[in-house]
Amino acid sequence: MTPAQRLRQLANLLNASTPLGLLLARLAGTTTLKGPRGLIIATGYDRKLPIAGAFAVGNVIIYRTGPEAALANSVLLGHEERHSTQYACLGLPFLALYFAAAGWSLLRHGNPASGNPFERHAGLEAGGYTYDGVPRLGRRRHRQ
């Protein structure tokens, strides 16, 4: 691991986001394994929410798929790794900030990602999202 990856790992341990991710993974009955770059991969998540195919809580990346499919998708892993770094910077308040940004994006764009700065920073396409650049809310109506 690089020094930055070790720092992220330590920050997410100290800010309790990785322990929360491990608790969530355990309660959901996932299988965990050591992943690359200090990440922990949890596979077999079958709860209804969130709907995403993968999501991060601290250094824990939780997938719906099995371990082979999870590790084979390096683009999605990179996207979730960027969320892991966001947790390292913001700690547990990241959860509330993320959901507020997703709600704002849903209101403005009709989806939780296009206007969400956390998803945009992590890479919309890498996370399986498409960009809807035209906000629904605040559009001007042209009179005829």
Question: Where do the model's predicted regions map?
Answer:
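Active-site-proximal flexible loops/turns
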Residues: 66, 86-90
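Active-site recognition of the HExxH zinc-binding catalytic motif
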Residues: 75-87
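Short pre-active-site segment immediately N-terminal to the catalytic Zn-binding motif
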Residues: 51-54, 61-77
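Metalloprotease/metallohydrolase-associated module, dominated by Zn2+-dependent proteases
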Residues: 2-51, 56, 90, 94-144
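Glutamate identity and glutamate-enriched acidic tracts
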Residues: 68, 80-81, 119, 125
